[in-house]
Regions:
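A glycine- and Lys/Arg-enriched "phosphate-lid" helix/loop adjacent to the NTP-binding pocket
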Residues: 292-358, 362-364
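P-loop (Walker A) phosphate-binding loop of NTP-binding proteins
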Residues: 212
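Conserved substrate/cofactor phosphate-moiety recognition/catalytic segment
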Residues: 222, 226-265
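Conserved lysine of the Walker
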Residues: 217
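Hydrophobic anchor at the beta1->P-loop junction of P-loop NTPases
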Residues: 209
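Conserved nucleotide-sensing/catalytic segment adjacent to the nucleotide-binding pocket
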Residues: 247-291
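Nucleotidyltransferase catalytic core that binds NTPs
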Residues: 1-205
Length: 373
């Protein structure tokens, strides 16, 4: 998908009766953006302030963990809605070419390919995918001069009167924003000050804590969040149940799933390394089946969400009735359903047993190892 800026965005502004034009008509920013960091944002913001229109192109071959095509597109379109954004991988480029009627689609040059291969590829994307030429390219690298020369030559082959492309170099020594994508990928949490909250959220490991009623999952989520200096996501279903005095209807199940998802998205931006989720849409799916014998297709989709870690609290201590719960037999039924459902979905999980202190220790060991036991 090509995300096009809203009509009129970034155009010349009117002050009284006179139009105040920016120095360039169309600017270009190209990068892997793996991930998008403050240095990249500085370059893009400078381009937006100096150009009537800005094109942002992102590709990488190979891709990097947490920085897939869809994620990079989300970062860029949310952060810079007034730019035209093209984020591609080979599959996406092939789809675009087919849609535009090209018989063959080029493949992305490898990250280690010669500079001129990348420059000609970008020129082709500008002209044939975006239908644009540019008069400025913004970078923070010295190679930008050669980039501008190749773009000029490529554009003038097709549009002889295309203006020469000027290179605008911003903070080449990275003194203003001393960071690189490589450094962030190696240590995203130590370098989070160079990432916007929305980008950092993509590196947060989401920990899903499941368990039957009165199995200690809420206490565990709170305790883990406090231990790691992070945040936890409360169970929205319980809040809605209390608000409606226990009188839930089938449509409430989808609302619960959506709200739980939305809370995770919002709180991930405030998390530190881990986000502890007191339940997931999988629990809502269970209650939808148990209470109404039906599950909305969208809720089934929400229940497919991937978590970095899944922990299941065993029902191995006394059942505490707080007025909202059923009984120990239902708790056992729910636990058995989780075990079966997680197995059928091939989801690895850590079974937490014993006291709160013992469960906390087991959870910490799991997070330290980075995998279920």
């Amino acid at each position: 998908m090509v995300v096009v800026a809203p009509q009129g965005a970034g155009r010349a502004k009117l002050w009284g009766d006179a139009a105040v034009s920016k120095p360039f008509c169309c600017g270009l920013v190209v990068g892997k953006f793996c991930p998008l960091h403050r240095g990249h944002e500085t370059v893009i913001e400078r381009a937006l302030s100096n150009c009537d229109e800005v094109l942002i192109i992102s590709y990488t071959q190979p891709e990097f963990e947490h920085c897939d095509r869809a994620t990079r597109e989300r970062w860029l379109t949310q952060g810079f809605p007034n730019a035209t954004t093209l984020v591609i991988d080979n599959a996406h480029l092939a789809q675009l070419c087919q849609r535009l009627g090209f018989a063959d689609a080029p493949t992305l040059p490898h990250n280690d390919a010669p500079d001129d291969d990348h420059r000609r590829f970008v020129a082709w994307l500008c002209r044939f995918i975006l239908g644009k030429t540019v008069d400025a390219v913004f970078t923070s690298e010295t190679y930008g001069d050669g980039f501008a020369q190749v773009l000029t030559a490529q554009f003038q082959q097709i549009v002889p009167n295309a203006p020469p492309v000027k290179h605008v170099c911003i903070d080449p020594g990275r003194s203003a924003v001393p960071i690189s994508g490589t450094r962030v990928r190696l240590s995203p949490h130590e370098n989070r000050q160079f990432l916007s909250p929305a980008v950092y959220a993509s590196f947060v490991e989401r920990v899903c804590i499941l368990g039957g009623e009165s199995s200690g999952k809420t206490t565990l989520a709170q305790t883990l969040a406090q231990h790691y200096g992070s945040v936890w996501v409360p169970e929205y279903g319980r809040e809605l149940w209390e608000r409606k005095n226990g009188q839930l209807v089938l449509s409430d199940m989808l609302e619960i799933g959506r709200q739980q998802w939305q809370r995770e998205e919002e709180l991930a931006c405030a998390a530190n390394r881990f986000l502890f989720c007191d339940t997931s849409a999988l629990t809502t799916l269970f209650y939808s089946q148990a209470m109404f014998g039906s599950v909305a297709p969208e809720l089934r989709s929400l229940a497919q969400r991937h978590y970095a870690h899944v922990m299941l609290c065993a029902p191995d201590f006394d059942f505490v009735q707080d007025g909202t719960r059923r009984d120990p037999a239902f708790r056992d039924q729910q636990h058995a359903w989780y075990v079966q459902e997680l197995a059928s979905r091939s989801i690895l999980y850590t079974l937490l047993t014993g006291t709160v202190a013992q469960r906390l220790q087991q959870a910490q060991s799991c997070l330290k190892r980075g995998k279920a036991q």
